[in-house]
Amino acid sequence: MVPSPLSELLECAHVVSLALTTPFRGLTQREAIIFDSPRGPSEWSPFVEYDDAEASLWLASAIEDCWHDSTLPEPPASIRVNGTIPAVSPQEATTLITKAGFPHTVKVKVGGPTSSLTEDHARVQAVRAALGPTGRIRLDANGAWALDEAEHAIRLMEHCDIDYVEQPVESLADMAVLRTRMAEIGIGLAADESIRRWADLDAVIAQGAADIVVIKVQPLGGLRRAHDTIKKAHAAGLQVVISSALETSVGIYHAATLQGFLESQNPHALDAGLGTVSFLGDDIVESPLRAHGGKLSVTKPRLDQGALTRLRASKDREQWWRARLERCFALL
């Protein structure tokens, strides 16, 4: 990839900070650089704790989105998405599902330092009660559990009819062991944090660590690499789920392109995890891509110039992001 000159990136970069409606992975603000390029907007939003090597892959994705022609068709008018329930009380979980229009599929956050197993179980039970018997439930532990702890938790919640558990443990070796243990009850495992680079999938396949892989466009370096990763996963007999990295509508749009392609190839493609704009208290486009009832209407993003001004990050954060951009650009 031959990236656009750094000066051009800096000239069209807007550093923004968006408040979250609910704390997510310990965050209360989501920071990003939005590039207002002549060919349309793109987003660069690696989490602040990521090192420059990892963040540079996200930058490659942002550059690809607006400075290189896509090999994929434009996304369809709508795509299927799951709802997402963060680590909230059962009552709040029920309220969120109602506000989301009762999506057919819901991902429930479990594990982590802010929620006990008892609280996790109660949350999942509330989601099952709200969805009824035909709704589909996914769990996402973000690698928070130890091996035996994960097995105990999954067996405890088995009665809630769980489709699969996303990254229940951190290491691939433990994922492989847990997958063998879970085979008897028919609950699959999905690799998310384990897939951060294109080559990571090779280790997942070699160790038999997952049934499903979670694909996020920015961390993999763009749509081309994400598409190649999907083809490799399918060749190995794995299913894929397209998911967000808690992006604005700009990032969600580019990921929706990939989901739309999957749905065009397979009408039974798994619902995407792209309905996360609802966790942002504001957005930087004229028509935010907010899901309802398990559907996400997809419109090409048009930046809201007033929002870019209103949501502009503080001077010190802007300087931090621009310095990060220069460092990461040098690694491309």
Predicted region positions:
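A short, acidic/glycine-rich surface segment
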Residues: 23, 91-92, 199
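Catalytic core of soluble alpha/beta enzymes
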Residues: 113-254, 280-285, 289-291
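Short, glycine/acidic-enriched capping/hinge loops at junctions between secondary-structure elements
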Residues: 26-27, 44-46, 54-55, 93-95
